[in-house]
Amino acid sequence: MTGGPLRWTPVPSRRIVFAVPDLTSTILPQLTSHRIPGLELGADAIHPHYAGLSLLNLAASIERWLGLPPGPHAPLQLPALDSLAQGAEQIVVCLLDALSLSRYLQWLDGPGRPLQGMVDAGLLAPLTSVVPSTTTSALTTLWTGRSPAEHGILGYELLLREYGLVANMITLGPAAFDNQRGLLERAGVRPQSLLPVPTLGTRLAQAGIEAHAYIGNSIRTSGLSRMHYADTTLHGFGSPADLWHSLRQLAERPPDGRRFAWAYYSGVDALSHVYGPDSDLVRAEFEFFVRAMNDLFVQPLERSAGRDVLLLLLSDHGQVATSPQPHRQLSLHPDLTRRLHLSPTGEARLSYLHLRPGEAEAARAYIDHEWPAEFTWLDSDEALRAGLFGPGTPCRQAASRLGDAILISHGAAYLWWADKPDTLLGRHGSLTAEEMIVPLLAVRLE
């Protein structure tokens, strides 16, 4: 992938391959043409489709399938998926971090071949992520049923003004110090208290529905995990084989009523950051994961009598290929940083600027001069009001966490402000199709 502007090229519909709905060709035009009124986000921007074709709406659908009272947001506008899910005894949702729709389709006939039996009997639909297109925001939406504006987890690094700290929202430690993970909790802050809305596990427990979450051992007790998985039975795993073996053991055990199981796997995302999302290593990791899913979960369950499972495979965002460029290091731009109260927050590809009074015009002019046409500048209050971060009433912390202005990256652009080497070959957070459009694959195993 080149460093120029990324263009979305729809992959031809695989009508011969899919025996039941492949909704890609009908839904993609809706996603690429959708616009949030009053917001100009750039020519390559995919606007989040919060009205019925986004991860926010998937959260509402899952709650409805499990019999929970309706939440504040619309479910997915996918009647075929509702029919597939109707009456399912168990719902298993697996999120494979950083898998864009385009890469999924490219890999389906190669490393994704183990999925073939699943797609022959299932449903494929493209959805948009939320804004920003990042794990902390998307997972929190899926586990609360609320938009990023409502739940307030608006990026990877956020200014938590109430604690006087820029925090890493995965580790809940200072963003500037990797060796202080969990500092907020050690200081007495309960991770769940950072969410102003209830989580799915708590709502399921109140309804008497069994809930499980399978998280890699290295992040099972992270701040973000502790924020999300209250009232949920938490399981660790060491590899994809371990994950799918454990999930099959759970699914083969008859539930007392309905059951919800969630799995999160970060291997594709981690390797994409280091080696680039188009590297052979990432393709191999994807193949390793889906082969384990097919061999240790899908095929054995299809041979098991009396099991009724709805399996969803989805992603939170994709990635774009980037190359480290010294000109993007803010330490080399004192004429910009002196106009900021503190370093940017949010994402390297969707940055929140905390401006000194009266410096907005000069900061914007500097950015336009140094990186022409690479960023779109948005007033943070305007973006929040217009619904870029989702519908609903924003939580009281949202405005301060977004700062004064937002920089939306185009093409492969980004900013780098961390006090460590810039080595990443894959990034996300912005609004390109590669970051925003993700696959949802569903199959009923019975």
Feature roles, as predicted:
Residues 17-75, 108-124, 128-259, 264-274:
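His/Asp/Glu-rich, glycine-adjacent segments
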Residues 93-96:
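Short hydrophobic beta-strand that contains or immediately precedes a catalytic carboxylate
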Residues 117-139, 337-357, 420:
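A short, conserved beta-to-alpha structural element at the edge of catalytic cores
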Residues 268-309:
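A long, amphipathic alpha-helix that forms part
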Residues 304-355:
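A beta-strand-loop signature enriched in Asp, Gly, Thr, and Trp
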Residues 340-446:
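Active-site neighborhoods of enzymes that stabilize oxyanions during catalysis
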